[in-house]
């Protein structure tokens, strides 16, 4: 159940980003943190946006493979200690992203008036928190 929930979140996130890589625009306007005027915080990096989405897809696939390895459904040529370390690190980073106060992201963000902030509070941060906890739980 824990593995299935984690893989469902990872699959959803990877599929959405893959859609962006291949030209999709749904959700694009709320895919990056925004300044009070609505412009993306990293507007100077927008030309790399689709390439970056592809990098995230690769990372999410690796996360899914590590989760499957830890659960015993897949064998990778990696030590169990390394798999555990990576999963704990990623899980802790996801939880931290959701709960550590920051200007643009997380439940305790300082800037709450943008469309991005609304999506982050209601969708992104809860998904990061749940996926982080599920990932850590898969290890312990």
Pin down the residues of each PLM region.
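Individual transmembrane alpha-helices with interfacial aromatic-anchor signatures
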Residues: 83-89, 114-131
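Juxtamembrane boundary at the C-terminal end of a transmembrane helix
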Residues: 70, 135-140
């Amino acid at each position: 159940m824990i593995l299935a929930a984690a893989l469902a979140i990872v699959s959803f996130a990877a599929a959405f980003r893959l859609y962006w890589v291949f030209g999709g625009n749904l959700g694009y306007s709320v895919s990056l943190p925004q300044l009070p005027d609505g412009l993306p915080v990293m507007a100077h990096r927008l030309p790399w946006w689709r390439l970056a989405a592809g990098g995230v897809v690769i990372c999410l696939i690796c996360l899914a493979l590590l989760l499957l390895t830890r659960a015993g459904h897949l064998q990778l040529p990696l030590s169990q200690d390394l798999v555990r370390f990576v999963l704990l690190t990623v899980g802790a980073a996801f939880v931290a992203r959701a709960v550590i106060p920051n200007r643009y992201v997380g439940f305790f963000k300082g800037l709450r008036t943008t469309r991005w902030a609304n999506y982050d509070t209601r969708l992104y941060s809860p998904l990061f928190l749940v996926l982080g906890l599920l990932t850590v739980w898969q290890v312990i």
